[in-house]
Amino acid sequence: MAESVITSYFPSQIASDQEKQSLEYGTTVGRAIEREWFNNDNGNSRFKSNQVSFHNLRLYARGEQSIQKYKDELSINGDLSYLNLDWKPVPIIPKFVDIVVNGISDRQFDIKAYSQDPYGVNKRTKYMESLIRDMQTKELNEFAEAEFGVNLFENNPETLPKNKEELDVHMQLSYKQQVELAEEQALNVLLDGNKYDLIKRRCNYDITTIGIGAVKNTFTKAEGAKVEYVDPVNLVWSYTDSPYFDDIYYVGEVKSVHLNELKKEFPWLTNDDLKEIAGQSVSNSGFYNRTINNNDEDDSNTVQVLYFNYKTFTNEVYKVKETATGASKIIPKTDEFNPPEEMYEEYGISKLSQSLEVLYEGVKIVGGKTLKWELAKNMIRPKSDYTKTKMNYSIVAPRMYKGRIESIVSR
């Protein structure tokens, strides 16, 4: 019986950390992504197929789809001279798309922050207990103030709740600590600065029309946390059955970048490097169908750049040595550290290690050289499991099945 052979163009995941950090490893990853998405051996690449499919769906959603198929059905041997029809498409789908997008884009919530630390909880509890005391001794306090001029109220008697229900509402709506107000304000400023509502509406429109939406999360010291809209037409990702893309091991996007912007991003590029990159872009323009996004002719000063994340793992290794005083000294080591068994007993040496998921960031000219490959400086890790990490791209395709994406417009 013949054995099945699975061909993979990606480098080994069990390579050493030193090998994974090399530029050659990143170049191999970039070429493997190109092999999966931009390979034209069968006459049509996966990337170009997505471009054409998403472009046609967006035309349908705008009521601007091609009418040639309608003419072919009504014509007789290609003759339309006897027909006097208005061939402009009836904009039926756009109305329903707007209804769906507007319905799911309505923001029906406000940001509310509640302190959960012991100090904040204790402060809230003391305030609530003071309100209860004032409610229980209200008549006595009013009598003391009227007869003796002594104010025994701990809070303003005019805003004092009358019963337990009003007390619960007051604690939920009226009471706010300064740290909670500051947190709410910070989150609102963050959302407003990133144009959250506009990006959310664009993602909702993409999910409705083409069945997939995406954003990119980044962090810089100058701008802080940033959320950027990503056009799904330019996305590449590893195969997944999950509509939330939470099990992919690589993801990226193709951007059309002008040479002057590329020079600012990578100052070490020389004029010869830029000429070589521009030549690679023109010779490999078949990878990327510009006519969908740009009606102009190919510009040799604009290149297609692949920005991608690659998920793998690293081994945190420590050497534990027992000192003369009986204490333990922990020394960081590379993943190649593997002392023989004799040293464990003779010198009191032991080894500690754990595996962590990590992200590598890469930048590659499509069909050309690799410009960047390094361990990501900022990684998103869930608090529940520090060993896990998340991609910088957040993608969702609610009606995806077996890798096939479906949308309301496509149905």
Predicted regions and their residues:
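Short, intrinsically disordered, charge-balanced linker/junction segments flanking boundaries
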Residues: 399-411
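Extended, helix-rich architectural segments
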Residues: 1-392
